[in-house]
Amino acid sequence: MKKLGTDLLKRGFAKMVKHGVVMDVTNVEQALIAEEAGATAVMALERVPADIRVQGGVARMSDPEMILEIKDAVSIPVMAKARIGHYVEAQVLESIGVDMVDESEVLTPADEVNHIDKRAFTAPFVCGARNLGEALRRIDEGAAMIRTKGEAGTGNVVEAVKHMRAVNEGIARVIGYKEMGLEAELIQMARNELKVPMELISEVAELKRLPVVNFAAGGIATPADAALMMQMGCDGVFVGSGIFKSGNPAVRAKAIVEATYNFDKPEVIAEVSKNLGEAMVGINIDEIPEEMLLAKRGI
């Protein structure tokens, strides 16, 4: 019988990459640059979100052979993406030994109603969220890590900021109700608004934060972007298109790592922000047609 990983073990792995940067890479060369720059993990995928956005079509799990080549080349953890609800893609990724599965809205959803039952897997999962309800529903399904959805492939951090602020505001409400002894309001919030078990709400109230590691993702393109998200309370950052769509990926990757570690030191962020070359060309969110917004996938 297959032995499933416990929540404790899965969340423990997620904590190992805390305070660090996870970088999207599409080949071994990029993975080595990311490792050299100090990434705590890499996300192996065939197309970064910016390319997926431009090229369109159905975006699926990457070729397992490509993922294995990257795993063989680096000593840091390797993550990979599965489509929302596509539990067979997740089974494949687990079988080849990826360290974490990202059930990602960047890929074309396979199921518009259900997410993967992540408790049925040994591998830990990370999932995106726009607010406290989405975050806690994914945790209830077994996610070991949460990240903001942001709006991937845009180089525009505004949506990640919006999502992190929404999570923080939701947590503040839970804490406030708890401190005022408003148990009935908490129960109603859990049942009707967030649609999660009361036990999760109690855990948030006790910890005064999400029960799992919470990273920023979606639109992070500069060292200052990374530091902004860390100052908002994120535990680390994912950087997708922002590094390898820039003019000098190796230098920018190191700078974002430095800014993430030194997020509360403006003088360090200023220093590492010098002479980075061209950042990726960004997209204003209001220029994206409604049907092309990725963050709305999977609620």
Curated annotation (Swiss-Prot):
- Active-site residues are K81 (schiff-base intermediate with d-ribose 5-phosphate)
Where D-glyceraldehyde 3-phosphate is bound, by residue? R165
Q: Which domain of life is it from?
A: Archaea
Chain residues that bind D-ribose 5-phosphate: D24, G153, G219, G240, S241
InterPro entries, per database record: Aldolase_TIM, PdxS/SNZ, PdxS/SNZ_N, RibuloseP-bd_barrel
User: Which pathway features in its UniProt record?
Assistant: Cofactor biosynthesis; pyridoxal 5'-phosphate biosynthesis
Keywords for this protein? Lyase, Pyridoxal phosphate, Schiff base
- What is catalysed by this protein? aldehydo-D-ribose 5-phosphate + D-glyceraldehyde 3-phosphate + L-glutamine = pyridoxal 5'-phosphate + L-glutamate + phosphate + 3 H2O + H(+)
Among the record's GO biological process terms, what is one? Answer: pyridoxal phosphate biosynthetic process
Q: Does the keyword Lyase apply?
A: yes
CDD domains linked:
pdxS
Q: Name one GO molecular function term.
A: pyridoxal 5'-phosphate synthase (glutamine hydrolysing) activity
Tell me which EC number(s) this protein carries. 4.3.3.6
Q: Which PANTHER family match?
A: PYRIDOXAL 5'-PHOSPHATE SYNTHASE SUBUNIT SNZ1-RELATED (PTHR31829:SF0)
Q: How does it assemble?
A: In the presence of PdxT, forms a dodecamer of heterodimers.
| Function as written in the Swiss-Prot or TrEMBL entry | Catalyzes the formation of pyridoxal 5'-phosphate from ribose 5-phosphate (RBP), glyceraldehyde 3-phosphate (G3P) and ammonia. The ammonia is provided by the PdxT subunit. Can also use ribulose 5-phosphate and dihydroxyacetone phosphate as substrates, resulting from enzyme-catalyzed isomerization of RBP and G3P, respectively.
- Family assignment from sequence similarity: Belongs to the PdxS/SNZ family.
Name this protein carries in UniProt: Pyridoxal 5'-phosphate synthase subunit PdxS
